[in-house]
Amino acid sequence: MGDGNLKKSKLSWPKTLVKKWLNIKSKSEDFHADDLDRGEGGGDWRNNVIEREEACSVRKSKTETRSKRNSGRARRNKLDVDPPLDHLRVFTATWNVAGKSPPSYLNLDDWLHTSPPSDIYVLGFQEIVPLNAGNVLGTEDNGPARKWVSLIRRTLNSLPGGSCQTPSPVPHPVAELDSDFEGDSAAGANSLFYHRSRSMRMDASASSLPQQFDRRFSVCDRFMLGDTPDDFYDQSFRYCSSEDEPADSPCHDHYSPVSRTGSFVADDRDKGRDKSKYCLVASKQMVGIFLTVWVKSDLRDSVNNLKVSCVGRGLMGYLGNKGSISISMSVHQTSFCFVCSHLTSGQKEGDELRRNSDVLEILRKTRFPRVNNAGDDKSPQMISEHDRVIWLGDLNYRIALSYRSAKALVEMRDWRALLEKDQLRIEQRKGCVFEGWKEGTIYFPPTYKYSNNSDIYAGDDRLPKAKRRTPAWCDRILWHGSGISQLSYVRGESRFSDHRPVYSLFSVEIESAYRNRIKKSSSYTSSRIEVEELLPQRYGYSELNPY
Protein backbone atom coordinates (compact mmCIF):
# COMPACT_ATOMS: atom_id res chain seq x y z
CA MET A 1 0.00 0.00 0.00
CA GLY A 2 2.75 2.40 0.96
CA ASP A 3 4.77 1.53 -2.16
CA GLY A 4 1.73 2.19 -4.34
CA ASN A 5 1.19 5.63 -2.85
CA LEU A 6 4.87 6.46 -3.17
CA LYS A 7 4.79 5.42 -6.83
CA LYS A 8 1.69 7.53 -7.41
CA SER A 9 3.36 10.52 -5.77
CA LYS A 10 6.42 10.14 -7.97
CA LEU A 11 4.28 9.89 -11.09
CA SER A 12 2.39 13.05 -10.15
CA TRP A 13 5.57 15.10 -9.87
CA PRO A 14 6.22 15.34 -13.66
CA LYS A 15 2.56 16.19 -14.17
CA THR A 16 2.85 19.06 -11.72
CA LEU A 17 6.08 20.23 -13.32
CA VAL A 18 4.51 20.28 -16.79
CA LYS A 19 1.53 22.22 -15.48
CA LYS A 20 3.77 24.83 -13.91
CA TRP A 21 6.10 25.25 -16.88
CA LEU A 22 3.26 25.40 -19.43
CA ASN A 23 1.19 27.64 -17.15
CA ILE A 24 -1.76 25.26 -17.21
CA LYS A 25 -4.15 26.69 -14.68
CA SER A 26 -5.93 24.45 -12.23
CA LYS A 27 -9.69 24.50 -12.07
CA SER A 28 -11.18 27.50 -10.34
CA GLU A 29 -13.07 25.10 -8.07
CA ASP A 30 -9.83 23.70 -6.65
CA PHE A 31 -9.60 25.24 -3.23
CA HIS A 32 -9.98 24.07 0.34
CA ALA A 33 -13.01 24.72 2.52
CA ASP A 34 -14.83 23.27 5.48
CA ASP A 35 -17.50 20.73 4.64
CA LEU A 36 -20.78 22.62 4.58
CA ASP A 37 -22.74 19.48 5.35
CA ARG A 38 -21.14 19.09 8.77
CA GLY A 39 -22.61 20.69 11.84
CA GLU A 40 -19.26 21.86 13.14
CA GLY A 41 -16.67 24.18 11.66
CA GLY A 42 -13.85 21.67 11.81
CA GLY A 43 -15.08 19.69 8.84
CA ASP A 44 -13.32 18.29 5.81
CA TRP A 45 -11.23 20.27 3.41
CA ARG A 46 -12.13 19.70 -0.20
CA ASN A 47 -9.72 19.84 -3.08
CA ASN A 48 -12.59 19.92 -5.54
CA VAL A 49 -15.73 21.87 -4.80
CA ILE A 50 -17.51 20.58 -7.88
CA GLU A 51 -19.50 18.30 -5.57
CA ARG A 52 -20.78 21.35 -3.75
CA GLU A 53 -21.68 23.12 -7.00
CA GLU A 54 -23.48 19.99 -8.25
CA ALA A 55 -25.46 19.76 -5.02
CA CYS A 56 -26.45 23.39 -5.37
CA SER A 57 -27.46 22.91 -9.02
CA VAL A 58 -29.60 19.88 -8.09
CA ARG A 59 -31.39 21.87 -5.42
CA LYS A 60 -31.80 24.76 -7.84
CA SER A 61 -33.25 22.52 -10.57
CA LYS A 62 -35.92 21.29 -8.17
CA THR A 63 -36.99 24.77 -7.12
CA GLU A 64 -36.12 26.82 -10.20
CA THR A 65 -39.66 26.83 -11.64
CA ARG A 66 -41.24 27.60 -8.30
CA SER A 67 -38.72 30.36 -7.60
CA LYS A 68 -39.52 32.03 -10.91
CA ARG A 69 -43.23 31.90 -10.17
CA ASN A 70 -42.63 33.20 -6.66
CA SER A 71 -40.62 36.14 -7.95
CA GLY A 72 -43.40 36.86 -10.43
CA ARG A 73 -45.96 36.83 -7.63
CA ALA A 74 -43.73 39.12 -5.60
CA ARG A 75 -43.54 41.60 -8.46
CA ARG A 76 -47.28 41.31 -8.90
CA ASN A 77 -47.73 42.25 -5.26
CA LYS A 78 -45.50 45.29 -5.88
CA LEU A 79 -42.95 44.52 -3.20
CA ASP A 80 -40.68 47.35 -4.25
CA VAL A 81 -38.44 47.61 -1.19
CA ASP A 82 -35.07 49.35 -1.26
CA PRO A 83 -32.39 46.98 0.03
CA PRO A 84 -31.53 48.03 3.61
CA LEU A 85 -27.89 48.01 4.63
CA ASP A 86 -26.23 45.99 7.35
CA HIS A 87 -22.59 46.18 8.38
CA LEU A 88 -19.97 43.49 8.79
CA ARG A 89 -16.67 43.73 10.61
CA VAL A 90 -13.95 42.44 8.30
CA PHE A 91 -10.49 41.76 9.74
CA THR A 92 -7.69 41.56 7.16
CA ALA A 93 -4.02 40.78 7.64
CA THR A 94 -0.92 40.17 5.56
CA TRP A 95 2.31 38.57 6.68
CA ASN A 96 5.45 37.51 4.86
CA VAL A 97 6.76 34.72 7.08
CA ALA A 98 10.11 34.32 5.29
CA GLY A 99 9.72 30.64 4.44
CA LYS A 100 9.28 29.55 8.05
CA SER A 101 6.81 26.89 9.09
CA PRO A 102 4.82 27.88 12.22
CA PRO A 103 5.99 26.11 15.39
CA SER A 104 3.59 24.67 17.91
CA TYR A 105 4.30 27.42 20.45
CA LEU A 106 3.41 30.29 18.09
CA ASN A 107 0.54 32.10 19.80
CA LEU A 108 -1.87 33.97 17.52
CA ASP A 109 -4.22 35.17 20.27
CA ASP A 110 -2.95 38.74 20.32
CA TRP A 111 -3.11 38.86 16.54
CA LEU A 112 -6.65 37.59 15.95
CA HIS A 113 -8.45 38.46 19.17
CA THR A 114 -10.28 41.69 18.40
CA SER A 115 -13.01 43.21 20.52
CA PRO A 116 -15.71 42.60 19.49
CA PRO A 117 -14.83 39.65 17.24
CA SER A 118 -15.09 40.26 13.51
CA ASP A 119 -17.59 38.62 11.19
CA ILE A 120 -15.05 37.81 8.48
CA TYR A 121 -11.31 37.14 8.76
CA VAL A 122 -9.16 37.42 5.63
CA LEU A 123 -5.60 36.27 6.30
CA GLY A 124 -2.96 36.37 3.59
CA PHE A 125 0.57 34.99 3.80
CA GLN A 126 3.63 35.15 1.60
CA GLU A 127 6.57 32.76 1.60
CA ILE A 128 4.93 30.11 3.75
CA VAL A 129 7.52 27.82 2.16
CA PRO A 130 11.08 28.68 1.10
CA LEU A 131 11.16 29.93 -2.49
CA ASN A 132 13.72 27.38 -3.62
CA ALA A 133 13.78 25.48 -6.91
CA GLY A 134 12.10 22.44 -5.38
CA ASN A 135 9.04 24.39 -4.27
CA VAL A 136 8.87 26.69 -7.30
CA LEU A 137 9.43 24.10 -10.03
CA GLY A 138 8.31 20.94 -8.29
CA THR A 139 5.53 19.87 -5.98
CA GLU A 140 4.19 22.31 -3.44
CA ASP A 141 4.73 21.68 0.26
CA ASN A 142 1.27 21.81 1.84
CA GLY A 143 2.47 21.03 5.35
CA PRO A 144 2.95 24.64 6.53
CA ALA A 145 -0.42 25.64 5.08
CA ARG A 146 -2.16 22.95 7.11
CA LYS A 147 -0.32 24.11 10.22
CA TRP A 148 -1.42 27.71 9.70
CA VAL A 149 -5.03 26.62 9.18
CA SER A 150 -4.93 24.53 12.35
CA LEU A 151 -3.50 27.42 14.39
CA ILE A 152 -5.99 29.91 12.96
CA ARG A 153 -8.94 27.59 13.54
CA ARG A 154 -7.93 26.95 17.12
CA THR A 155 -7.43 30.67 17.78
CA LEU A 156 -10.65 31.88 16.16
CA ASN A 157 -12.76 29.25 17.89
CA SER A 158 -11.33 30.29 21.25
CA LEU A 159 -12.48 33.88 20.82
CA PRO A 160 -14.42 35.15 23.86
CA GLY A 161 -18.17 35.35 23.50
CA GLY A 162 -20.58 33.33 21.43
CA SER A 163 -21.43 33.64 17.79
CA CYS A 164 -24.00 36.26 16.89
CA GLN A 165 -27.13 35.70 14.85
CA THR A 166 -26.97 39.16 13.29
CA PRO A 167 -24.16 41.14 11.70
CA SER A 168 -22.11 43.33 13.96
CA PRO A 169 -23.24 46.92 14.55
CA VAL A 170 -21.17 49.74 13.15
CA PRO A 171 -18.45 50.55 15.69
CA HIS A 172 -17.04 54.01 16.06
CA PRO A 173 -13.82 54.57 14.12
CA VAL A 174 -10.74 54.25 16.26
CA ALA A 175 -9.18 57.36 14.79
CA GLU A 176 -9.73 59.83 11.99
CA LEU A 177 -7.65 58.60 9.08
CA ASP A 178 -7.12 62.10 7.68
CA SER A 179 -5.61 63.45 10.87
CA ASP A 180 -2.12 64.91 10.95
CA PHE A 181 0.88 62.64 10.74
CA GLU A 182 2.36 64.34 13.74
CA GLY A 183 -0.57 63.25 15.90
CA ASP A 184 1.19 60.64 17.98
CA SER A 185 -1.72 60.55 20.39
CA ALA A 186 -4.08 59.75 17.56
CA ALA A 187 -1.69 57.13 16.36
CA GLY A 188 -1.66 55.60 19.80
CA ALA A 189 -5.43 55.53 19.88
CA ASN A 190 -5.49 53.95 16.47
CA SER A 191 -3.11 51.20 17.50
CA LEU A 192 -5.74 48.64 18.36
CA PHE A 193 -3.26 45.84 17.79
CA TYR A 194 -0.04 47.82 17.91
CA HIS A 195 1.25 46.73 21.29
CA ARG A 196 1.82 43.01 20.99
CA SER A 197 2.79 40.68 23.76
CA ARG A 198 5.85 38.50 23.62
CA SER A 199 3.70 35.49 22.86
CA MET A 200 4.21 35.97 19.11
CA ARG A 201 7.95 36.56 19.40
CA MET A 202 10.63 34.01 18.67
CA ASP A 203 12.71 34.07 21.80
CA ALA A 204 16.08 32.36 21.91
CA SER A 205 14.80 29.68 24.24
CA ALA A 206 11.93 28.90 21.90
CA SER A 207 14.22 28.73 18.90
CA SER A 208 16.11 25.87 20.46
CA LEU A 209 13.05 23.61 20.49
CA PRO A 210 13.08 20.73 18.01
CA GLN A 211 11.43 21.42 14.69
CA GLN A 212 8.66 19.35 13.19
CA PHE A 213 9.05 17.54 9.90
CA ASP A 214 6.45 17.94 7.17
CA ARG A 215 4.98 15.35 4.84
CA ARG A 216 4.92 16.67 1.29
CA PHE A 217 1.93 16.37 -1.01
CA SER A 218 1.59 17.01 -4.72
CA VAL A 219 -0.85 19.68 -5.75
CA CYS A 220 -2.20 17.18 -8.28
CA ASP A 221 -3.02 14.55 -5.66
CA ARG A 222 -6.60 14.47 -4.43
CA PHE A 223 -6.83 14.24 -0.69
CA MET A 224 -9.42 14.91 1.95
CA LEU A 225 -8.49 16.47 5.24
CA GLY A 226 -10.75 15.49 8.07
CA ASP A 227 -11.17 16.92 11.53
CA THR A 228 -8.06 18.66 12.70
CA PRO A 229 -7.53 18.28 16.45
CA ASP A 230 -7.48 21.53 18.35
CA ASP A 231 -4.29 20.38 20.03
CA PHE A 232 -2.75 19.36 16.72
CA TYR A 233 0.65 20.37 18.00
CA ASP A 234 0.52 18.16 21.04
CA GLN A 235 3.75 16.25 21.47
CA SER A 236 1.93 13.00 20.75
CA PHE A 237 1.34 14.26 17.22
CA ARG A 238 4.26 14.31 14.88
CA TYR A 239 4.60 13.43 11.27
CA CYS A 240 7.37 13.29 8.73
CA SER A 241 8.14 12.07 5.27
CA SER A 242 9.83 8.75 4.83
CA GLU A 243 12.20 10.48 2.46
CA ASP A 244 13.18 13.06 5.06
CA GLU A 245 13.94 10.70 7.92
CA PRO A 246 15.72 7.33 8.12
CA ALA A 247 13.77 4.28 9.19
CA ASP A 248 15.12 4.44 12.73
CA SER A 249 14.26 8.12 13.10
CA PRO A 250 12.55 9.03 16.38
CA CYS A 251 9.64 10.44 14.44
CA HIS A 252 8.55 6.91 13.58
CA ASP A 253 7.98 6.29 17.28
CA HIS A 254 5.21 8.90 17.36
CA TYR A 255 1.66 8.63 16.11
CA SER A 256 1.17 10.32 12.74
CA PRO A 257 -2.00 12.37 12.20
CA VAL A 258 -1.53 11.94 8.46
CA SER A 259 -2.49 8.53 7.19
CA ARG A 260 -1.08 6.90 4.09
CA THR A 261 -4.12 8.10 2.17
CA GLY A 262 -3.30 11.69 3.01
CA SER A 263 -6.07 12.21 5.55
CA PHE A 264 -5.94 13.62 9.03
CA VAL A 265 -7.05 11.23 11.75
CA ALA A 266 -9.25 12.97 14.28
CA ASP A 267 -8.64 12.50 17.94
CA ASP A 268 -11.54 10.83 19.75
CA ARG A 269 -11.97 13.74 22.11
CA ASP A 270 -12.22 16.06 19.12
CA LYS A 271 -15.31 14.36 17.71
CA GLY A 272 -17.59 15.56 20.45
CA ARG A 273 -16.57 19.16 20.55
CA ASP A 274 -19.07 21.98 20.34
CA LYS A 275 -20.03 23.69 17.14
CA SER A 276 -17.24 25.92 15.91
CA LYS A 277 -17.73 29.67 15.99
CA TYR A 278 -15.88 30.16 12.70
CA CYS A 279 -15.55 28.06 9.59
CA LEU A 280 -13.15 28.10 6.69
CA VAL A 281 -15.01 29.07 3.53
CA ALA A 282 -11.98 29.07 1.22
CA SER A 283 -8.22 28.73 1.26
CA LYS A 284 -5.75 28.47 -1.58
CA GLN A 285 -1.98 28.05 -1.89
CA MET A 286 0.23 28.91 -4.85
CA VAL A 287 3.83 28.04 -3.98
CA GLY A 288 4.50 30.46 -1.10
CA ILE A 289 1.35 32.59 -1.37
CA PHE A 290 -1.49 31.46 0.87
CA LEU A 291 -4.91 33.08 1.33
CA THR A 292 -7.62 31.99 3.78
CA VAL A 293 -11.11 33.38 4.39
CA TRP A 294 -13.04 32.58 7.56
CA VAL A 295 -16.58 33.59 8.49
CA LYS A 296 -18.79 33.20 11.53
CA SER A 297 -20.64 29.92 11.37
CA ASP A 298 -23.97 31.74 11.51
CA LEU A 299 -22.95 33.67 8.40
CA ARG A 300 -21.82 30.64 6.42
CA ASP A 301 -25.15 29.98 4.69
CA SER A 302 -25.17 33.55 3.39
CA VAL A 303 -21.86 33.07 1.55
CA ASN A 304 -22.20 31.91 -2.04
CA ASN A 305 -20.58 32.06 -5.49
CA LEU A 306 -17.16 31.10 -4.13
CA LYS A 307 -14.46 31.14 -6.81
CA VAL A 308 -10.67 31.33 -6.85
CA SER A 309 -8.27 32.69 -9.45
CA CYS A 310 -4.46 32.51 -9.42
CA VAL A 311 -2.03 34.55 -11.51
CA GLY A 312 1.66 33.63 -11.60
CA ARG A 313 4.18 36.45 -12.11
CA GLY A 314 7.38 34.77 -11.02
CA LEU A 315 10.01 33.01 -13.13
CA MET A 316 9.51 33.71 -16.84
CA GLY A 317 6.47 35.79 -15.88
CA TYR A 318 4.37 32.68 -15.27
CA LEU A 319 5.48 30.65 -12.26
CA GLY A 320 3.93 31.07 -8.85
CA ASN A 321 6.84 32.22 -6.71
CA LYS A 322 5.38 35.69 -7.32
CA GLY A 323 1.84 36.60 -8.27
CA SER A 324 -1.58 36.62 -6.67
CA ILE A 325 -4.45 34.56 -5.32
CA SER A 326 -7.93 36.09 -5.53
CA ILE A 327 -11.07 34.80 -3.84
CA SER A 328 -14.46 35.96 -5.08
CA MET A 329 -17.61 35.45 -3.05
CA SER A 330 -20.95 37.02 -2.26
CA VAL A 331 -22.48 37.70 1.13
CA HIS A 332 -26.22 38.00 0.55
CA GLN A 333 -26.51 40.56 -2.26
CA THR A 334 -23.00 42.04 -2.00
CA SER A 335 -19.98 40.73 -3.90
CA PHE A 336 -16.51 40.65 -2.34
CA CYS A 337 -13.07 40.07 -3.81
CA PHE A 338 -10.00 39.48 -1.65
CA VAL A 339 -6.62 39.62 -3.37
CA CYS A 340 -3.38 38.41 -1.77
CA SER A 341 -0.25 39.17 -3.78
CA HIS A 342 3.51 38.93 -3.63
CA LEU A 343 4.99 41.32 -6.20
CA THR A 344 8.45 41.52 -7.76
CA SER A 345 11.19 42.28 -5.25
CA GLY A 346 14.22 44.52 -5.60
CA GLN A 347 15.23 48.01 -4.49
CA LYS A 348 17.09 49.11 -7.61
CA GLU A 349 15.79 52.08 -9.56
CA GLY A 350 13.21 50.85 -12.05
CA ASP A 351 12.10 47.82 -10.04
CA GLU A 352 8.92 49.70 -9.15
CA LEU A 353 7.94 49.59 -12.83
CA ARG A 354 8.02 45.80 -12.71
CA ARG A 355 5.76 45.89 -9.68
CA ASN A 356 3.38 48.20 -11.56
CA SER A 357 3.34 45.67 -14.38
CA ASP A 358 2.56 42.87 -11.91
CA VAL A 359 -0.48 44.76 -10.62
CA LEU A 360 -1.77 45.52 -14.12
CA GLU A 361 -1.35 41.90 -15.21
CA ILE A 362 -3.10 40.62 -12.09
CA LEU A 363 -6.03 42.93 -12.76
CA ARG A 364 -6.11 41.87 -16.40
CA LYS A 365 -5.65 38.11 -16.00
CA THR A 366 -7.72 37.41 -12.90
CA ARG A 367 -10.97 35.84 -14.06
CA PHE A 368 -13.89 34.22 -12.25
CA PRO A 369 -15.79 32.28 -14.94
CA ARG A 370 -19.49 31.92 -14.46
CA VAL A 371 -20.85 28.44 -13.89
CA ASN A 372 -23.65 27.41 -16.24
CA ASN A 373 -26.97 26.62 -14.56
CA ALA A 374 -25.56 27.58 -11.16
CA GLY A 375 -27.50 30.80 -10.69
CA ASP A 376 -24.49 33.10 -10.93
CA ASP A 377 -25.17 34.53 -14.39
CA LYS A 378 -24.70 38.02 -12.95
CA SER A 379 -21.70 37.31 -10.73
CA PRO A 380 -18.60 39.49 -11.32
CA GLN A 381 -15.90 38.04 -13.54
CA MET A 382 -13.11 40.56 -12.90
CA ILE A 383 -11.65 42.11 -9.76
CA SER A 384 -12.93 45.59 -10.60
CA GLU A 385 -16.50 44.35 -11.09
CA HIS A 386 -16.96 43.45 -7.41
CA ASP A 387 -18.82 45.69 -4.98
CA ARG A 388 -16.10 45.52 -2.30
CA VAL A 389 -12.45 44.72 -3.01
CA ILE A 390 -9.59 44.42 -0.51
CA TRP A 391 -6.03 43.92 -1.78
CA LEU A 392 -3.37 42.84 0.68
CA GLY A 393 0.11 41.40 0.53
CA ASP A 394 3.82 41.99 0.20
CA LEU A 395 3.66 44.59 -2.56
CA ASN A 396 7.42 45.13 -2.24
CA TYR A 397 7.31 48.87 -3.00
CA ARG A 398 10.35 50.52 -1.44
CA ILE A 399 11.40 53.97 -0.24
CA ALA A 400 13.33 55.96 -2.82
CA LEU A 401 16.04 57.09 -0.42
CA SER A 402 19.48 55.92 0.56
CA TYR A 403 19.79 53.63 3.55
CA ARG A 404 21.25 56.35 5.77
CA SER A 405 18.61 58.94 4.85
CA ALA A 406 15.73 56.53 5.35
CA LYS A 407 17.18 55.25 8.62
CA ALA A 408 17.51 58.80 9.95
CA LEU A 409 13.85 59.54 9.17
CA VAL A 410 12.80 56.28 10.81
CA GLU A 411 14.68 57.21 13.99
CA MET A 412 12.91 60.60 13.98
CA ARG A 413 9.58 58.84 13.29
CA ASP A 414 8.98 61.28 10.47
CA TRP A 415 6.48 59.16 8.58
CA ARG A 416 5.31 62.08 6.42
CA ALA A 417 8.77 62.62 4.92
CA LEU A 418 9.24 58.89 4.40
CA LEU A 419 5.86 58.47 2.70
CA GLU A 420 6.69 61.27 0.29
CA LYS A 421 9.41 58.95 -1.03
CA ASP A 422 7.31 55.80 -0.85
CA GLN A 423 7.24 54.24 -4.31
CA LEU A 424 3.62 53.10 -4.04
CA ARG A 425 2.40 56.59 -3.18
CA ILE A 426 4.56 58.10 -5.92
CA GLU A 427 3.25 55.69 -8.56
CA GLN A 428 -0.33 56.25 -7.40
CA ARG A 429 0.04 60.01 -7.73
CA LYS A 430 1.33 59.52 -11.26
CA GLY A 431 -1.70 57.39 -12.08
CA CYS A 432 0.51 54.42 -12.97
CA VAL A 433 -0.92 51.90 -10.52
CA PHE A 434 -3.88 51.41 -8.14
CA GLU A 435 -5.68 54.44 -9.54
CA GLY A 436 -8.85 55.02 -7.53
CA TRP A 437 -7.76 52.68 -4.73
CA LYS A 438 -7.53 53.82 -1.12
CA GLU A 439 -5.10 53.17 1.70
CA GLY A 440 -5.33 54.32 5.29
CA THR A 441 -2.89 56.70 6.91
CA ILE A 442 0.29 54.94 8.01
CA TYR A 443 1.31 55.66 11.60
CA PHE A 444 3.67 52.72 12.06
CA PRO A 445 7.36 52.17 11.22
CA PRO A 446 8.42 50.38 8.03
CA THR A 447 7.71 46.66 8.19
CA TYR A 448 10.82 45.41 6.32
CA LYS A 449 13.61 44.30 6.72
CA TYR A 450 14.49 43.16 10.25
CA SER A 451 17.39 41.06 11.44
CA ASN A 452 16.63 37.58 12.66
CA ASN A 453 14.66 37.51 15.93
CA SER A 454 15.26 41.17 16.72
CA ASP A 455 13.77 44.65 16.49
CA ILE A 456 16.81 45.92 14.58
CA TYR A 457 16.65 46.65 10.88
CA ALA A 458 18.95 44.51 8.74
CA GLY A 459 22.22 46.36 8.30
CA ASP A 460 22.16 48.07 11.69
CA ASP A 461 23.97 45.19 13.34
CA ARG A 462 26.78 45.50 10.76
CA LEU A 463 27.30 41.79 10.55
CA PRO A 464 29.49 40.87 7.58
CA LYS A 465 26.91 38.48 6.09
CA ALA A 466 23.89 40.68 6.75
CA LYS A 467 22.18 42.11 3.68
CA ARG A 468 21.53 45.80 4.05
CA ARG A 469 18.03 46.75 2.96
CA THR A 470 16.56 50.22 3.12
CA PRO A 471 13.59 50.08 5.54
CA ALA A 472 10.32 50.09 3.62
CA TRP A 473 6.57 49.59 3.94
CA CYS A 474 6.51 46.48 1.76
CA ASP A 475 3.39 45.04 3.39
CA ARG A 476 0.21 46.94 2.56
CA ILE A 477 -3.58 46.73 2.58
CA LEU A 478 -5.67 48.71 0.09
CA TRP A 479 -9.33 48.72 -0.83
CA HIS A 480 -11.63 49.70 -3.68
CA GLY A 481 -15.35 50.34 -3.83
CA SER A 482 -17.95 52.19 -1.81
CA GLY A 483 -19.37 51.11 1.52
CA ILE A 484 -15.98 50.36 3.11
CA SER A 485 -14.81 52.26 6.19
CA GLN A 486 -11.40 51.54 7.68
CA LEU A 487 -11.41 51.43 11.47
CA SER A 488 -7.73 50.70 12.07
CA TYR A 489 -4.50 50.16 10.12
CA VAL A 490 -1.60 48.94 12.21
CA ARG A 491 1.29 46.50 12.35
CA GLY A 492 2.21 43.74 14.78
CA GLU A 493 5.50 43.27 16.61
CA SER A 494 6.20 39.58 16.09
CA ARG A 495 9.87 38.68 15.59
CA PHE A 496 8.97 35.45 13.80
CA SER A 497 9.94 36.84 10.39
CA ASP A 498 12.04 39.59 8.82
CA HIS A 499 8.68 41.25 8.00
CA ARG A 500 6.23 42.62 10.53
CA PRO A 501 2.60 41.60 10.00
CA VAL A 502 0.11 44.31 9.03
CA TYR A 503 -3.57 44.31 10.02
CA SER A 504 -6.60 46.36 9.13
CA LEU A 505 -10.14 46.33 10.44
CA PHE A 506 -13.02 47.44 8.21
CA SER A 507 -16.70 48.11 8.59
CA VAL A 508 -18.33 47.00 5.34
CA GLU A 509 -21.87 47.67 4.17
CA ILE A 510 -23.84 44.75 2.75
CA GLU A 511 -27.33 44.40 1.34
CA SER A 512 -28.93 41.59 3.27
CA ALA A 513 -32.33 42.40 4.78
CA TYR A 514 -33.85 42.67 1.30
CA ARG A 515 -33.31 38.96 0.74
CA ASN A 516 -34.95 38.16 4.08
CA ARG A 517 -38.00 40.21 3.20
CA ILE A 518 -38.34 38.59 -0.21
CA LYS A 519 -37.91 35.18 1.41
CA LYS A 520 -40.64 35.97 3.92
CA SER A 521 -43.01 37.29 1.26
CA SER A 522 -42.27 34.41 -1.08
CA SER A 523 -43.20 31.97 1.68
CA TYR A 524 -46.73 33.39 1.61
CA THR A 525 -46.94 33.29 -2.19
CA SER A 526 -45.49 29.79 -2.14
CA SER A 527 -48.34 28.58 0.04
CA ARG A 528 -50.85 30.18 -2.32
CA ILE A 529 -49.15 28.54 -5.30
CA GLU A 530 -49.34 25.12 -3.68
CA VAL A 531 -53.08 25.60 -3.05
CA GLU A 532 -53.55 26.77 -6.62
CA GLU A 533 -51.90 23.65 -7.99
CA LEU A 534 -54.36 21.43 -6.07
CA LEU A 535 -57.49 23.21 -7.31
CA PRO A 536 -59.27 22.57 -10.62
CA GLN A 537 -57.81 24.52 -13.52
CA ARG A 538 -61.01 26.56 -14.09
CA TYR A 539 -60.16 28.58 -10.97
CA GLY A 540 -57.56 31.23 -11.60
CA TYR A 541 -55.19 32.80 -9.15
CA SER A 542 -56.85 36.20 -9.47
CA GLU A 543 -60.23 34.73 -8.53
CA LEU A 544 -58.89 33.04 -5.39
CA ASN A 545 -56.49 35.70 -4.19
CA PRO A 546 -57.90 36.91 -0.83
CA TYR A 547 -55.28 39.65 -0.46
From Swiss-Prot:
Protein family (similarity comment): Belongs to the inositol polyphosphate 5-phosphatase family.
Protein's UniProt name: Type I inositol polyphosphate 5-phosphatase 4
Family annotation (PANTHER family): TYPE I INOSITOL POLYPHOSPHATE 5-PHOSPHATASE 4 (PTHR45666:SF22), TYPE IV INOSITOL POLYPHOSPHATE 5-PHOSPHATASE 9 (PTHR45666)
EC annotation from Swiss-Prot or TrEMBL: 3.1.3.-
Alphabetized UniProt keyword annotations: Hydrolase
Keyword Hydrolase assigned: yes
InterPro entries found in the cross-reference section: Endo/exonu/phosph_ase_sf, IP5P_plant, IPPc
Stretch list, region Catalytic 1: 387-402
GO molecular function: inositol-polyphosphate 5-phosphatase activity
Catalytic 2, as annotated region: 467-482
GO BP: phosphatidylinositol dephosphorylation
Location of the region described as Disordered in the Swiss-Prot/TrEMBL record: 56-80
One Pfam assignment: Exo_endo_phos2
Encoding gene (name): IP5P4
Compositionally biased tracts (Basic and acidic residues): 56-67
Superkingdom field: Eukaryota
